[in-house]
């Protein structure tokens, strides 16, 4: 490593979108391996016109019934909206920066370690009005970005699919509330797999009595190595393979005896589940 500080923000002029600046409204974050530095950018704010008197400054709020967000919700979120930043990254090994998020795809899913080489971005605003009426979580568009090359791949469009990274960052997984399936996406291969359906088991809330799609019984953790993960139904634990090479496997037999099994995490410092060790359920 180097023994002195080096200013890297000067290089931003070569990749930062025109009219944008590096923002101080988002904390800096290094990936666990130190390779990537994440930060936020934002459009430059217009200079305040100091020549106008207070009564010459327009102070009018206009809203309609067609707005995607309620007027009251917009007011509550106004401060956050003003501080909105878009994720960017600096590769400490290559010495290069890259804009990741944008006004068109403003939100991100980062793996816990943020080590890359992929991250996911999403936008739920096109479906905000639908979500307001039907309830959260709402539909969203999702894409993935390669931190090294900048390659982008469209992953999902218009699906009610808040996704999560498996530990290790190899796969994205999610439960689709609309069709009640468990799914995965392999960024490297660009492939989507349906891992469990209603023919496999009943993974949706069986006693849901709300006027909305039923939620799942939950993700339970990633097995050591990052190539398998566990989910629950009402009674049992299941092992799913995000590569879809092996079928879903039920690990317990609680449904037959009306006994519910859920995994208890006794070591929050260990982010993987070691299948060779005893687990508390």
Predicted regions and their residues:
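Beta-propeller folds
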Residues: 1-281
């Amino acid at each position: 490593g180097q023994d002195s500080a080096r200013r890297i923000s000067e290089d931003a002029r070569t990749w930062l979108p025109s009219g944008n600046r590096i923002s101080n409204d988002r904390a800096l974050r290094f990936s666990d391996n130190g390779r990537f530095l994440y930060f936020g950018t934002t459009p430059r704010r217009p200079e305040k016109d100091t020549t106008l008197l207070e009564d010459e400054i327009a102070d009018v709020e206009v809203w309609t019934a067609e707005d995607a967000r309620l007027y009251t919700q917009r007011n509550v979120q106004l401060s956050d909206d003003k501080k909105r930043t878009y994720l960017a990254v600096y590769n400490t090994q290559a010495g290069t920066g890259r804009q990741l998020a944008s006004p068109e795809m403003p939100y991100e899913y980062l793996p816990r370690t943020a080590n890359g080489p992929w991250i996911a971005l999403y936008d739920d605003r096109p479906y905000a009005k639908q979500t307001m009426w039907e309830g959260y979580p709402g539909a969203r568009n999702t894409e993935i970005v390669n931190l090294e090359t900048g390659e982008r791949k469209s992953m999902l469009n218009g699906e009610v699919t808040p996704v999560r990274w498996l530990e290790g960052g190899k796969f994205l997984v999610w439960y689709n509330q609309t069709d009640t399936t468990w799914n995965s996406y392999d960024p490297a291969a660009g492939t989507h797999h349906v891992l469990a359906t209603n023919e496999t088991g009943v993974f949706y809330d069986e006693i849901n009595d709300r006027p909305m799609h039923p939620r799942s019984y939950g993700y339970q953790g990633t097995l050591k190595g990052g190539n398998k993960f566990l989910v629950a139904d009402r009674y049992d634990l299941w092992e799913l393979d995000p590569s879809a090479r092996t079928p879903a496997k039920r690990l317990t037999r609680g449904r037959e005896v009306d006994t519910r099994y859920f995994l208890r995490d006794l070591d929050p410092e260990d982010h993987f589940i070691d299948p060779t060790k005893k687990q508390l359920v």
